Regions:
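An extended, acidic, His-containing surface patch that forms the Zn2+-binding/catalytic region
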Residues: 21-99, 107-120, 128, 132-228
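Generic solvent-exposed, charged/amphipathic alpha-helical segments
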Residues: 8, 12, 122-126, 159
């Protein structure tokens, strides 16, 4: 059996038609969004037409039952980051590859244990692998998810500082970016970390042509001064 075809079919079975992750036990520890959190995420400015234009797509795809803002920041993901197999040079070669590999990442949400999730995914991949193939799963690094209460004293002070500096009521949201050390701060140092985002949607974080709006930068300075 062609390894590239086998791997493609295997990975295709990891996501259901409704956009959910097809790994037994994957969602067992996921904490449901509260009504308060859903109201806050609903306040995040959103236009489906503008979002599709920004992404360069004609149609959005995601987990059914959740809005795009909820999917992006509050639901776990299973993503293929890269696929490698067969001839990659110029022109074509009528070969059958001897191997195929994929790089996979999963963004987790509060209460999910990364070591447990890695075990579940590895076990499921091996269980689904066809008998004609030999599969090896190499586990990479992992970090625990982190969330902080938006109603504590420091949170209230931060929100008031943002409102003073920017002249608008702050919008609370969850973010899928990974900063593993903030969970260590909470677990080891017993302190909360508040991530006060100043970037705009088109600032291209960690991407080519990354930028930062000067007005947002300046108002961020005032926000920090107000807070501390």
């Amino acid at each position: 059996e062609n390894p590239a075809m086998a791997l493609s079919k295997l990975l295709g079975r990891m996501i259901n038609k409704n956009g959910s992750i097809n790994v037994p036990g994957f969602y067992d520890d996921v904490v449901k969004l509260t009504a308060y959190e859903r109201r806050q995420l609903a306040r995040v400015p959103y236009s489906e037409a503008k979002y599709k234009k920004l992404l360069g797509v004609k149609l959005l795809f995601g987990e059914k039952g959740f809005t795009p803002n909820e999917q992006r920041g509050a639901r776990p993901t299973f993503e293929i980051n890269g696929l490698t197999s067969g001839y990659q040079g110029e022109g074509s070669k009528t070969i059958v590859p001897s191997f195929a590999s994929a790089k996979i990442t999963m963004r987790l949400v509060p209460n999910q244990n990364p070591k447990k999730i890695l075990r579940l995914v590895a076990r499921h991949l091996k269980a689904l692998s066809p008998p004609t193939m030999r599969i090896e799963v190499e586990l990479g690094h992992a970090a625990d998810p982190y969330i902080v209460s938006p109603t504590g004293p420091l949170a209230k002070a931060a929100l008031e500082s943002l409102k003073t500096a920017f002249g608008h009521e702050p919008v609370l949201l969850r973010e899928g970016g990974s900063i593993p050390i903030v969970e260590h701060f909470a677990r080891i140092l017993k302190v909360d970390t508040y991530l006060l985002g100043l970037a705009l949607p088109d600032d291209n974080l960690h991407s080519p042509n990354e930028k930062m709006d000067l007005e947002a930068f300046t108002r961020g300075i005032w926000m920090s001064a107000n807070l501390w």
